[in-house]
Amino acid sequence: MPPSQTPAQGSGRFLLLSPPSLSSHPEKLNAILGLHARESTDLQMLDRLALGLVSLPESTYDVVLLLTGADNTLAETYRLVSRGVLQGVVNSLKPGGKLRNRDNQIWGSGSDSAAGLGSSDGDGGGGEKMSSSEQAFRNEAILAGLVFDDRGELAKPDFGAQQAVPLKLGRKKNLGESAFGNGAVELPASNGVRVTTGATSSTTTTTTTTAAAAAATAATPTTTTTTTINSSTPSGVGFIDFSDDFGVPMVEETQDSDEELIDEEELLGEYDMGRHIVQPPECRPKAGKRRRACKDCTCGLSQKLEAEDRAKRANADKALETLKLRTNDLAEVDFTVQGKVGSCGNCALGDAFRCDGCPYIGLPAFKPGEEVRLLNNDVQL
């Protein structure tokens, strides 16, 4: 099918994924947009989607269309569609939605597929030999959850509505009455030991017999062991001794055994650590309001807020460094000099009556003319 043609599209909501090279040719992009209803068609750039700058809504689109680049090939598209991008595209498809390309040459309902000239593997591909990038894209699409339908198109499977199915468990009726008539229940025999529990009796009798003795008389047991049980035991209840090891020694594992411990750091590779964190829309900060991070934050908002707090704290500590006074900034006050009083003349009355420049600020009230001395940092009047 020539690149200028586009297969007929059905009704529904469409998503067009355009490579960045197509944005430099607006005439081609406008021609493609003109083939679809604008009110039911969305356009996204693959490079923005790959960088995590935009996110796709879930279960919204009926058809996702991959556009070819400016060179009319899908090479640029395959290079940008990574595993994470493809998983987001699959999540945005409705159940039964289709993933198509513009020309339907690699998959889809092209003329080769419709005529039954697909590849020998029967997966709906075209008759031409696929390149490594095309085959890798098909494999990633299958791993993301897409399947090939009867027409050879990549589709999201529709599993239908899930509902709970009640399960009715069968129950044997009158098991004890049919066996003994008195409500007693016989447990399965093991190693020639038969265990019988009585409904009204307060004892459980364990009897071991041989085949010859049983044929001679059923009333003469070889060995009889009687264990007293609480009289409140309900009918038809048996007891199992879980402490019995049946002759097999039990090996206790040491507490310091770390054979089954898994290092979580080994589960993430360099590719996973370098991937861009996609922040959910509800965690994105709004203008004029600072959003608090969740307790188990995994989108990176908690680390971002902690980094901002550390930067603010560092700037505040730098601005509030210890104030160092130079010699010119110091002033010496000698209280022994006679006649040195404030301009208000109320120095002896106390701080409440002294002016701002009074040399006696901080000293208690004293009598006018009284000598003031300082001994061991204490005021002596």
From Swiss-Prot:
Keyword vocabulary terms for this entry: 2Fe-2S, 4Fe-4S, Cytoplasm, Iron, Iron-sulfur, Metal-binding, Mitochondrion
A GO biological process held by the record: iron-sulfur cluster assembly
Record field: compositional bias (Low complexity): 108-118
Superkingdom of the source species: Eukaryota
Binding site for [2Fe-2S] cluster: C283, C294, C297, C299
Residue span of region Fe-S binding site A: 283-299
Motif Cx2C motif 1: chain residues: 344-347
Gene Ontology cellular component list: mitochondrial intermembrane space
Region: Linker, residue numbers: 166-273
Ranges for region N-terminal SAM-like domain: 8-165
Subcellular location: Cytoplasm; Mitochondrion intermembrane space
Segments carrying motif Cx2C motif 2: 355-358
Region annotation (Disordered) ranges: 100-134
Region of interest (Fe-S binding site B), ranges: 344-358
Coiled coil regions, renumbered to chain: none
Gene Ontology MF: a single term: metal ion binding
Family indicated by similarity: Belongs to the anamorsin family.
Function: Component of the cytosolic iron-sulfur (Fe-S) protein assembly (CIA) machinery required for the maturation of extramitochondrial Fe-S proteins. Part of an electron transfer chain functioning in an early step of cytosolic Fe-S biogenesis, facilitating the de novo assembly of a [4Fe-4S] cluster on the scaffold complex CFD1-NBP35. Electrons are transferred to DRE2 from NADPH via the FAD- and FMN-containing protein TAH18.
Assembly and interaction partners: Monomer. Interacts with TAH18. Interacts with MIA40.
Domain comment (free text): The C-terminal domain binds 2 Fe-S clusters but is otherwise mostly in an intrinsically disordered conformation. The N-terminal domain has structural similarity with S-adenosyl-L-methionine-dependent methyltransferases, but does not bind S-adenosyl-L-methionine. It is required for correct assembly of the 2 Fe-S clusters.
Name of this protein: Fe-S cluster assembly protein DRE2
Species of the source: Paracoccidioides brasiliensis (strain Pb18)
Organism ancestry: Eukaryota, Fungi, Dikarya, Ascomycota, Pezizomycotina
The encoding gene: DRE2
